């Protein structure tokens, strides 16, 4: 592998770390994530030890990319990471920090299920170093929660959010996010908007508001429920977007809304084509490499870890690794970048893909004519029209080189 630049002006993007904890209380019928229903005691300490060894191997194997870099953010996802004790999370974060430095303003997010978090555990996570909690609320309607297979009810959800608000008021938590879904089975427009109003009333700094989609190999795929039609979905989105905007939330990504200054750093790094280490069952990572004193990236790799806990707990970590060909980089870059509503700096395209702007000139001319984007000398900007035709826009880059 090629050496990364150690110069002050390295072309490498920010570096994050994703940690996957695969266990949950029960598998939700819509979930296609790598999660495994808890059937016995979770081997918490054993798994944490393997996570640390996994990270050590990555830091050695990918040394030319990660040397002299600090972690910009950490995201602990699942599964249900809040099944792990606060002591376990504290030990894990401490061991990580001993192996790779943290940025002074690092964002550390932990996903939590309201049905698995007591107030003491919440407090313990913040004492462990977690400064952002992401809560999988999904709905405040108990009937919908049952259909979705969630283990919490609306009262438990609001109680968890209230405690997160208290922790934030005490400066023990920088931010918190609520995950909320719409387009649920047999959901009316008014029910979806009522969910959103209740979420807004709780004043989270960040809201992830996304449409339920039926994914392959899920229980919903085998027994499809009745979902709102396209007209109803459009009404939900349009009226919901107005509610969020009126409440002071800014949409910065397809499904992400935040109060000013509370965008999720970790997800922004994904969408800005940043780098991320990945440890844990089924975790996916991306790393860039650059030659000494180079102004641009010249190699990008993607890799994934062993999915099943059985193999992972036997020390079989790395499952697959591949180089991202130059012919694929434009599509991958814009597939991420055009999810964001901010301008795309042309200089960053060259820096992070190692390609010249001329490689996408014809595609951009066509996109301009179609009204998918606007352009100035420094950047490209997706339009409202472009958001509606995002797939058509991205198809332009499938074979560019």
Regions found by a protein language model. Give the residues of each.
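Short amphipathic alpha-helical interaction segments
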Residues: 354-366
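Basic, amphipathic "hinge/linker" alpha-helix immediately C-terminal to the N-terminal HTH DNA-binding motif
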Residues: 380-387
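A short, conserved structural fragment
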Residues: 369-378
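Short, amphipathic alpha-helical interaction segments positioned at domain boundaries
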Residues: 387-401
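Local cysteine-cluster metal-coordination motifs and their immediate loop/turn environment
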Residues: 22-35
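Beta-strand-connecting loop/turn residues
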Residues: 24, 205, 275, 378-379
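C-terminal scaffold of the Radical SAM
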Residues: 2-16, 33-62, 69-355
């Amino acid at each position: 592998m090629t050496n990364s630049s150690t110069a002050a002006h390295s072309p490498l993007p920010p570096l994050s770390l994703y940690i996957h904890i695969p266990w949950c209380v029960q598998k939700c019928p819509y979930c296609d994530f790598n999660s495994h229903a808890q059937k016995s005691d979770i081997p918490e300490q054993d798994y944490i030890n393997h996570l640390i060894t996994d990270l050590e191997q990555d830091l050695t194997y990918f040394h030319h990319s990660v040397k002299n870099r600090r972690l910009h953010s950490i995201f602990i996802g699942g599964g249900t990471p809040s099944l792990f004790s606060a002591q376990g999370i504290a030990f894990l974060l401490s061991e990580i920090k001993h192996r790779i430095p943290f940025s002074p303003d690092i964002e550390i997010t932990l996903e939590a299920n309201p049905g698995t978090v007591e107030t003491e555990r919440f407090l313990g996570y913040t004492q462990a170093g977690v400064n952002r909690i992401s809560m999988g609320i999904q709905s405040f309607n108990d009937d919908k929660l049952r259909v979705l297979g969630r283990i919490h009810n609306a009262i438990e959800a609001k109680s968890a959010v209230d405690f997160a608000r208290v922790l934030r008021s005490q400066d023990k938590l920088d931010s918190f996010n609520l995950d909320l879904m719409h387009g649920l089975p047999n959901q009316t427009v008014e029910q979806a908007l009522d969910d959103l109003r209740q979420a807004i009333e709780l004043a989270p700094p960040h809201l992830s508001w996304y449409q339920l989609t039926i994914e392959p190999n899920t229980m919903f795929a085998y027994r499809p429920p009745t979902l709102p039609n396209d007209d109803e979905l459009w009404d939900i989105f349009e009226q919901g977007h107005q509610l969020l905007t009126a409440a002071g939330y800014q949409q910065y990504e397809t499904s992400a809304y935040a109060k000013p200054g509370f965008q999720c750093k970790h997800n922004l790094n994904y969408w800005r084509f940043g780098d991320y280490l990945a440890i844990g069952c089924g975790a996916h990572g991306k790393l860039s490499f650059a030659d000494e004193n180079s102004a641009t990236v010249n190699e990008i790799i993607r890799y994934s870890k062993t999915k099943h806990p059985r193999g992972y707990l036997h020390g079989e970590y790395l499952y697959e690794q591949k180089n991202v060909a130059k012919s694929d980089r434009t599509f991958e870059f814009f597939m991420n970048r055009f999810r964001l509503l901010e301008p795309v700096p042309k200089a960053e395209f060259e820096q992070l893909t190692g390609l010249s702007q001329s490689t996408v000139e014809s595609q951009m001319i066509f996109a301009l004519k179609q009204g998918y984007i606007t352009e100035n000398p420094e950047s490209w900007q997706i339009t409202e029209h472009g958001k509606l035709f995002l797939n058509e826009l991205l198809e332009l880059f499938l074979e560019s080189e």
